[in-house]
C-alpha cells in the first residue's frame, strides 16, 4: 500500500522541519499526524484519533481549530517546542489535484510576536552566541516584538561572563555555532541548572563573510562592529535565523547597540537567586523584589523597571535621573 498524496505532501514538509511540530491546515483545523500528533495530544490534552493515510494502519492524528491556534502554540512554546505553520494556499475545488500548501512561519520560543503568546510585562529574548577559534565570544540578543538588538564581546573569563549574561538576559531561546555548543556544556547554568539549552545553528550562518553581509543589509549602524568580528558573526547569524523562521526581514529591527558592562553592576546567577530580584526562592514571581515594587502602568514601563533591576547602573547621573522620574 502507498501513502495518500496528501500524506506524502505532509511528510515532505516534516522532512524539512524534523525538530518542529507541524501544524498542517485542513479546512477549519490545523492537524498533526504520526509522532507530532502523539506529542501534541499529550502536551495539549487533545483527543488522539486516526486518519486513513494509505497504509495498513491509520495515522495517529489530533487537531486544533484555526481560530484558537495561537493559544495552543503558546502552550507548546512555553514547554520548549518549535511549531511550523503549513497553510493552505488554494481552496479545495479551486483547481484539480491536491490543495497547494506552504510553510508560512516557524514559531520558536524566541521568535513569538503575537500578543497571545507573550507576557507584555517582560521581554522575550532570542540569543545568538558565537565562539571563535581563539576563545573569544560574540553574543547578540534581540526581542523581535520590540526591535531591541544588543551585542556583547567576551574576551576573557568566558564561562563566568556567559553565565552572568544568561542569568541577566534570561533568553527564551539560544542558537550557537558548533564550537559554542561544545563549550556550553561547561556552563553551570546548563550542566546543573538545566535552565538553558544551546541549539546548534548552521555554521555557515556564523561565518564572518555571510554574517557581515547580513549585518550590513539590516543594521544601519553596522560600522559599530568594527574590530569586533566575533559580534559580527553572532549578530549576522541571529538576523539570518530571524529571516529564516519569519520568512521575511523584520523592518523594525534597524540598528543595534553594545552592552556596556562598565556602566552597570555585575551580579552573578547565585547572587540574583539569593536577592530574589525576579523570583522568590520557590521560583515564583510572588515574594520577589520586582513583584513588590512594580507599580508601573504600562507594559513598556514594566519592562524598563525589570531592566533597571537586572542591570543596576553605576553612573551617578543616570541614577539621579531615574530617581527624579519617580
Cite the ranges covered by each PLM segment.
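Charged catalytic and DNA/RNA-contacting regions of genome-maintenance
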Residues: 1-326
Amino acid at each position: 500500500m502507498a501513502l495518500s498524496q496528501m500524506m506524502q505532501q505532509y511528510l515532505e514538509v516534516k522532512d524539512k522541519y524534523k525538530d518542529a511540530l507541524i501544524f498542517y491546515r485542513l479546512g477549519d483545523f490545523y492537524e498533526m499526524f504520526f509522532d507530532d500528533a502523539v506529542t501534541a495530544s499529550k502536551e495539549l490534552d487533545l483527543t488522539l484519533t486516526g486518519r486513513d493515510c494509505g497504509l495498513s494502519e491509520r495515522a495517529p492524528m489530533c487537531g486544533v481549530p484555526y481560530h484558537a491556534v495561537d493559544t495552543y502554540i503558546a502552550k507548546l512554546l512555553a514547554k520548549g517546542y518549535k511549531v511550523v505553520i503549513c497553510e493552505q494556499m488554494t481552496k479545495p475545488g479551486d483547481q484539480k489535484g491536491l490543495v497547494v500548501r506552504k510553510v508560512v512561519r516557524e514559531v520558536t520560543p524566541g521568535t513569538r510576536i503575537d500578543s497571545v503568546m507573550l507576557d507584555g510585562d517582560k521581554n522575550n529574548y532570542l540569543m545568538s552566541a558565537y565562539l571563535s577559534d581563539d576563545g573569544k565570544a560574540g553574543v547578540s540578543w534581540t526581542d523581535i516584538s520590540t526591535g531591541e538588538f544588543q551585542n556583547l564581546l567576551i574576551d576573557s573569563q568566558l564561562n563566568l561572563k556567559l553565565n552572568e549574561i544568561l542569568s541577566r538576559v534570561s533568553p527564551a531561546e539560544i542558537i550557537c555555532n558548533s564550537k559554542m555548543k561544545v563549550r556550553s556544556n561547561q556552563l553551570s547554568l546548563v550542566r546543573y541548572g538545566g535552565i538553558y539549552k544551546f541549539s546548534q545553528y548552521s555554521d555557515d550562518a556564523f561565518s564572518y563573510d555571510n554574517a557581515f553581509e547580513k549585518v550590513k543589509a539590516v543594521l544601519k549602524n553596522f560600522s559599530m562592529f568594527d574590530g569586533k568580528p566575533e559580534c559580527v558573526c553572532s549578530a549576522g547569524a541571529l538576523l539570518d535565523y530571524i529571516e529564516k523562521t519569519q520568512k521575511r526581514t523584520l523592518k523594525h529591527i534597524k540598528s543595534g547597540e553594545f552592552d556596556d558592562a562598565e556602566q552597570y553592576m555585575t551580579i552573578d546567577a547565585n547572587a540574583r537567586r539569593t536577592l530574589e530580584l525576579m523570583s522568590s526562592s520557590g521560583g515564583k514571581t510572588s515574594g520577589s523584589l520586582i513583584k513588590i515594587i512594580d507599580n508601573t502602568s504600562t507594559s513598556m514601563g514594566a519592562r524598563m523597571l525589570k531592566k533597571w533591576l537586572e542591570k543596576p547602573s553605576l553612573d551617578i547621573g543616570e541614577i539621579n535621573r531615574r530617581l527624579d522620574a519617580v
